[in-house]
């Protein structure tokens, strides 16, 4: 995991640092107790006074650690205060670890906050987007795309992941980039159909039909490709008709209020089916 080493308390190694357990003389002293690194890991929430003392006296290395842990736990107040000190004193730390932890643990507001404070959405070869797609967090995917995340390097891998794991909302948002899926179209559609993922298959077919219409002038010069696509789409539509069993996924429009993650929606659908 990226940045996993920062969770190791042994990284707090400076013997002159207040974090060193040997420097804690008075157990009743709030400052010393708070600088015990074990307290940082065990406490889920600091009161405002504790937080101020802790953050204002931390070294950059420990500040980075606390920021990352706060992002992981989703404690937005702590994240805001830490970022305030970082910006005020122009402290140079890596806030991208925190961004990845916030995405992995689905803390949308913290993701927005970190991006607004300069976190790199293309960090580590697109890890933020990869994490969002892996977990099916389509509102985070949408946020990253709105912020102009780079989707050029691994878009086909991301789309394939959506098809393999039946993530229709994530797939739909990624395809809003108006990309051509010709190189992997047949593979992805067949993958969806083989697994019974009708909605994902219909999204791909609709996108490809729309893309073919937009680029019809260029496709005239590629007769073989157009013919093979047409034959594939006819077969796909017949198979989809059996899968859908009368359900109209082709005219599906996502409700603007429908936010969350694909995995959560799948669970809700299963519950409804059981009832």
Curated annotation (Swiss-Prot):
Residues 255-275 have a biased composition (Acidic residues). Keywords: ANK repeat, Repeat. InterPro entries: Ankyrin_rpt (IPR002110), Ankyrin_rpt-contain_sf (IPR036770), Multifunctional_ANK_Repeat (IPR051165). It comes from the Viruses. It holds the Pfam family Ank_2. Transmembrane segments: none annotated. Residues 253-275 are annotated as: Disordered. The keyword Protease does not apply. ANK repeats lie at residues 94-123, 124-153, 155-183, 184-213. This is Putative ankyrin repeat protein L715. The lineage of its organism: Viruses, Varidnaviria, Bamfordvirae, Nucleocytoviricota, Megaviricetes.
């Amino acid at each position: 995991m990226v940045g996993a080493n920062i969770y190791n308390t042994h990284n707090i190694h400076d013997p002159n640092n207040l974090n060193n357990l040997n420097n804690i003389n008075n157990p009743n002293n709030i400052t010393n107790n708070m600088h015990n690194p074990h307290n940082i890991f065990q406490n889920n929430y600091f009161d405002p006074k504790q937080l101020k003392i802790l953050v204002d006296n931390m070294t950059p290395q420990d500040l980075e650690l606390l920021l990352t842990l706060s992002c992981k736990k989703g404690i937005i107040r702590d994240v805001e205060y830490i970022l305030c000190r970082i910006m005020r004193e122009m402290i140079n730390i890596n806030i991208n670890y925190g961004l990845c932890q916030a995405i992995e643990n689905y803390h949308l507001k913290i993701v927005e906050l970190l991006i607004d404070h300069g976190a790199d959405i293309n960090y580590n070869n697109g890890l933020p987007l990869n994490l969002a797609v892996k977990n099916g967090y389509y509102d985070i995917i949408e946020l990253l795309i709105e912020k102009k995340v780079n989707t050029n390097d691994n878009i086909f891998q991301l789309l394939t992941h959506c098809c393999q794991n039946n993530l229709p909302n994530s797939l739909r948002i990624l395809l809003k980039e108006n990309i051509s899926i010709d190189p992997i179209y047949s593979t992805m559609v067949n993958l969806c159909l083989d697994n019974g993922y009708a909605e994902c298959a219909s999204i791909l077919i609709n996108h490809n039909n729309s893309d073919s219409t937009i680029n019809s002038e260029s496709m005239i010069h590629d007769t073989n490709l157009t013919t093979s696509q047409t034959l594939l789409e006819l077969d796909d539509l017949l198979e989809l008709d059996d899968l859908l069993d009368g359900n109209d996924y082709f005219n599906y429009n996502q409700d603007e209020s429908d936010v969350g993650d694909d995995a959560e929606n799948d669970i809700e659908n299963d519950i409804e089916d059981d009832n």
